[in-house]
Amino acid sequence: MASPQGGYPPQEGYGQQPVAYGAPVQQPGEAPAPQVHTGGRKKRAYAGEAFEIGSGANAALGGQPPAGGAYGAYPPQQPAYGADPSQMAQGYAPPVAPGVAQMTQQFGAMGVTDPHLMPPQQAPQAPQAPQAPRAVPLNQLYPTDLLTQPFNVAELDYPPPPIVLAPGTSVYPSPYANCPPKYVRSTLNAVPTTHSLLKKSKLPFALVIQPYAALHDAEDQVPVIPDQVISRCRRCRSYINPFVTFLDHGHRWRCNMCNLTNDVPQAFDWDATLQKPADRALRPDLNHAVVEFVAPQEYMVRPPQPLVYLFLIDVSYASVTNGLLATSARCIKESLDRIPNADRRTRLGFIAVDSSLHYFSIPRDGSETSDPRMLVVSDLDEPFLPIPGDLLVTLSECRENIEVFLDKLQEMFQNTQNNSCAMGSALRAGYKLISPVGGKMTVLTSSLPNVGHGALTMREDKKVLGTSKESSLLQTANSFYKSFAVECSKAQVSVDMFLFSSQYQDVASLSNLPRYTGGQTYFYPGWNAARSEDAIKFAREFSDYLSSEIGLEAVLRVRATTGLRMSTFYGNFFNRSSDLCAFPAFPRDQAYVVEVAIDETVTKPVVCLQTAVLHTTCNGERRIRVLTLALPTTQNLADVYASADQQAIATFFSHKAVERTLGSGLEQAREALQAKAVELLSTYRKELAGGSVGGGGLQFPANLRGLPVLFLALIKNLGLRKSAQIPTDMRSAALCLLSTLPLPLLIQYIYPKMYSLHDMPDNAGLPDEQTGEIVLPPPINLSSERIVPYGLYLIDDGQTQFLWVGRDAVPQLLLDVFGLPDRSQLRVGKQNLPELDNDFNGRVRAVVEKSRDHRSKGVGSIVVPHLYVVKEDGEPGLRLWAQTMLVEDRADQGVSLVQWMGSLREKV
């Protein structure tokens, strides 16, 4: 089987054993090499021939280093480091992170509980009268040496540095007053008061915003304020929030953004449902940083839009033969009950596309005929609507006949020989059909649009891959896709692309439509419904896609304290004005990045940044979701570094790198990332580590130790890495992910998770006693050094999973996991694990499934990763693809982590 990467040629350097930075080969936290058993210790079933308990990556539960080898352990003076209780409810009591064992003992002696479980700050007390908050000490800076204390993957699971606010900062002492990191994360949790200090730090100041943490409201409920009493500042239009102050016996409030004094609305303290006075201290908008207001009439330009899905389905030869037409028709039919339709206004339409456009008029249920009528239009230059009505039908009124139509759709085109695809003209026609109401055009296609509007040609050239000319292939080939996207955005039309080609499809051009309309590009390379794994993956994902409670006709704006300005916005939307982002549809599985400029000196001890998303719910209600984040300010560079969030910074630079790739080229994007890593290390060394460090170390704060590793992993990601083997479509699809994924999924896509399964702890793969969630084994570093030849490993980047089977895996392990007595019978490639009647099989399947669980990561996503079984001595293309996930190794044209740290050390 050819690997989806086009089959990497074996490169030198694969599987090399890099030496730990200036240390013996055995990494701290890794058990000694397996010895032949002496018969004296208890052995695992799979280990009879090979190893004893107490060896392998999980030997010390969590790769605990020997005493004294504490990597990035935060010293005990700072019990609050990053402890956000909500972050920690990730389905298991947090694994004892490397080096935290010593901390825990010291805390125990001090009478302090586990540092990971302490609240980030004391709940502020309600002020009797407005008072200036006292200055409180911010996070302390803990320098570490990146060369003598190598990075441990568990550090990526630490929460961000806590936001330290003085007591009394919020109007009421609510634990929910500040925005949780799953919705908004700042790259800096202590904000410089001046532009010059920010510039000196060389750190970016940006927000990573993910307004929704799940595809459905029920999975992530936020307080809804139904009374339509929305109090906003008259000058800056900020919404009242937990950080305002009340004056004049509570009759007026001072805006925490611009300081203007506003009147409190009369109805603010009145409970309209109970018709009696209400306690202001219980109002959600004064206690919760994340709330949703039901909007009154003045927030609507027109009646709320209904949910509209127009399906543009490719019915050319490629799409019929690979099973896309049949699978998508069946999947839509089976998902009709999942499409949101509480207000019974949801409308659907269908256009089939080959060298002509085929419209379908579907009669209402109970009409004389139930048969759909097909109307064919072959004028591709000026596509017209053959009949104005009946092409968009109401789901509730035509439910049965929509099913009749979907059953017949496949038969209509089953014998086609038509190789043309006029998808550009179909998009134009679809726009004509739904632009009066707005809605979503969902494109399902297996072909390159080769006739009509926006026709594209095969432009991939193997000879330019890996050269400077490759970057031109990542740009749009036809201006239609950008200009048409802007038209769509103005008419509240959003486009989603589901692409299934086995040949070049020009993802680079097609992905512009989702990019500017708040949509997404979903890419299924080499997909074929005859492979059950392919059919099941698409069916599950498409059904979740249709069920998602998207927002409609939405706009997003971020306001902030005087002195701060939103300068640049990144993500899939159209930037309508300097600070307004327009979304014809607002998805729930994407994040956005907003860069913040400091225009004038900030004089306040706390700044606030407030994100507001005005949208129509898919049930026809106009709402505003408001997310308010308060951050302390500082004039001290050490505070800025000590409170910087490495994952948010990596997310910001991921978006920057995609922008640079599309603007200047791949090489420039990679060089900019390396230059940034050097600049940050040099700045820290010069400004905060006293200029010169004895012994040639590489100093960086404990909270940023993962940043150089994340930069290397980003440079080696499919979207950016230097290689002559990566098909352009694969690269373009990866760039789409790097610029849209929610933060937890993006970090995993850049630095995948790897779990050792053959020696996982006894509780892994079983439900946790407290939470009932499946316990995952501790993750291990992405280095071939961590892989033993008799091992079984799961490697998961959130899009693809690999189950790596070592060449010396013992027969009992293969029997328990795969039900096969002999290694030679093990099939490699895409598959699902068999369900066998033994405990270990159940635990391995539970770990594979739990690793896919988006909800426990606090994000919405439709993706169900494929699982590939890889034999260490099996199919080379597949093996090399899996090995590209080991970002700490040397591979293809990329350096190892040891080489990378060495080169950074030289440049710093």
Curated annotation (Swiss-Prot):
Q: Where is this region: Zinc finger-like?
A: 233-258
Q: Which SUPFAM superfamilies match?
A: beta-sandwich domain of Sec23/24, C-terminal, gelsolin-like domain of Sec23/24, Helical domain of Sec23/24, vWA-like, Zn-finger domain of Sec23/24
- Residues binding Zn(2+) are C233, C236, C255, C258
Topology with regard to the membrane?
Peripheral membrane protein
Q: Where is the composition biased (Low complexity)?
A: 1-18
Q: Which Gene3D superfamilies match?
A: beta-sandwich domain of Sec23/24, Sec23/Sec24 helical domain, Severin, von Willebrand factor, type A domain, Zn-finger domain of Sec23/24
Q: Self-association or partners: how does it assemble?
A: The COPII coat is composed of at least 5 proteins: the sec23/24 complex, the sec13/31 complex, and the protein sar1. Golgi apparatus membrane; Peripheral membrane protein; Cytoplasmic side.
Entry's family note: Belongs to the SEC23/SEC24 family. SEC24 subfamily.
Q: What is this protein called?
A: Protein transport protein sec24
Please give the organism. Answer: Emericella nidulans (strain FGSC A4 / ATCC 38163 / CBS 112.46 / NRRL 194 / M139) (Aspergillus nidulans)
